[in-house]
Design a protein with these regions (language model features):
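Metallocofactor- and cofactor-centric catalytic cores in central/energy metabolism, strongly enriched
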Residues: 11-302
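N-terminal low-complexity segments that are often proline-rich with Ser/Thr-Pro
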Residues: 2-8, 300, 304
Length: 304
C-alpha cells in the first residue's frame, strides 16, 4: 500500500492504486438480495421479502442490486460536487479538483457535510420534543408532564433554581436551557456538556478547541468551512467535524433524551407484540416511527 503522508510528494499512481484496492475490498462486503434472504435470522422478514417478490414489489435490497456497480469515486469519497465548476474527482491525471482541493480535502469536506446533515436531522427531532416540553409547561400544549423525577434531577445538575417553585416552571426553564444549547448564536457555555460530560473529557475537548457553540451554529459553520475557497486545510475541516459530533451528541441525543424523559417519564421495560405478527388482520394498522415521538395538539402542529 502507498504510504500517504500529509504534505509529502507522492506517486499519484500509487495513491490511486491504494484507494482502489480499498474500494475493491469494500465492495466484497456488499450483500446481494439473495444473500440477505438466505442469511437473515428473522423468518418473518424472510417470508415477507419472498412474498413481496411474488407480488412484484421492489425493496431496498432490489434497488441496491440495481445500483451495482456503485461509482468508484463516490465509494472512495473523492468525488466533489460542492461548487458549479465540478463535479470533480481525483485521478492520477487530475490529482486536484478545479478549486485546488486534493483527495484529503475532498474526503474531509464530504465527511463534514455528512456530519452536519446528521446533526441537523437529529437536532430537528430534538427541537420538537424540547418545544413540546416548554409549551406543556406554559400551558400552550395540552400534554401532561410525567417526568418529575427526571426534571428535578436534571435541573439540579444544570443549576436551575427549584426551591418553592412549581414543577411546570422548573420544566420550562429546563426546556429553555436545552433550546439555547441547540440554537445559541453568541459563544457561551454549552450547559448540557458542562452538566453531562465527564470533567476529563471536557478538558480534552477544550484543549483541542472543539467545544461547540450550539448545534445550529456548528451546522452553519460546517457548510461555511467546507465551501469552495473557504478553508483549504483538511485538519481544520476535521476539527469542525468533531465539533459537529459533540453538538449532535449533546443536543440531538442527550438533550432530546432529557426532554423526552421529562415530558413522558422515564421508560419502563414492557412486553410488546413486535414484527409482522403485530399487524391485526381486518384493521387499519397505524405505524408510528419517529425518534422522538412528540404528541401535540392540532393547534400547535404548524407552529412546530
Amino acid at each position: 500500500k502507498a504510504d500517504h503522508q500529509d504534505g509529502e510528494e507522492e506517486d499519484p499512481q500509487a495513491f490511486i492504486r491504494d484507494y482502489m484496492d480499498a474500494v475493491n475490498e469494500y465492495r466484497k462486503t456488499f450483500p446481494a438480495k439473495e444473500d440477505v434472504v438466505s442469511q437473515i435470522p428473522d423468518p418473518a422478514v424472510r417470508e415477507m421479502l419472498l412474498r413481496m417478490e411474488q407480488l412484484g414489489i421492489d425493496t431496498a435490497f432490489d434497488r441496491f442490486d440495481q445500483q451495482k456497480p456503485q461509482c468508484n469515486f463516490g465509494l472512495a469519497g473523492i468525488c466533489c460536487k460542492i461548487c458549479n465548476m465540478g463535479p470533480c474527482r481525483i485521478t492520477a491525471k487530475a490529482p486536484k479538483g478545479v478549486c485546488g482541493a486534493d483527495a484529503d480535502l475532498i474526503v474531509a469536506r464530504n465527511l463534514l457535510r455528512s456530519a452536519a446533515a446528521g446533526a441537523a436531522q437529529h437536532g430537528m427531532h430534538a427541537r420538537e420534543v424540547m418545544l413540546a416540553l416548554k409549551w406543556a409547561a406554559e400551558g400552550r400544549l395540552d400534554v401532561p408532564i410525567l417526568g418529575e423525577q427526571k426534571i428535578r434531577s436534571t435541573a439540579e445538575a444544570f443549576g436551575i433554581k427549584q426551591k418553592n417553585r412549581q414543577l411546570k416552571n422548573v420544566a420550562r426553564d429546563l426546556a429553555d436551557v436545552l433550546l439555547e444549547d441547540l440554537s445559541r448564536t453568541v459563544p457561551d457555555e454549552y450547559k448540557t456538556i458542562s452538566a453531562c460530560a465527564a470533567q476529563e473529557r471536557r478538558e480534552v475537548w477544550e484543549t483541542l478547541d472543539i467545544l461547540p457553540v450550539s448545534a445550529y451554529h456548528e451546522v452553519f459553520e460546517a457548510y461555511h468551512k467546507s465551501g469552495c475557497a473557504t478553508d483549504g486545510d483538511w485538519k481544520s475541516i476535521m476539527q469542525q467535524f468533531l465539533r459537529c459530533g459533540l453538538a449532535f451528541t449533546f443536543s440531538g441525543v442527550v438533550g432530546a433524551s432529557i426532554a423526552t424523559d421529562s415530558l413522558f417519564g422515564v421508560g419502563d421495560r414492557v412486553t410488546s407484540k413486535v414484527n409482522i405478527g403485530a399487524l391485526e388482520k381486518g384493521y387499519v394498522n397505524i405505524y408510528l416511527r419517529r425518534h422522538p415521538v412528540s404528541y401535540r395538539s392540532e393547534e400547535h402542529t404548524s407552529e412546530l
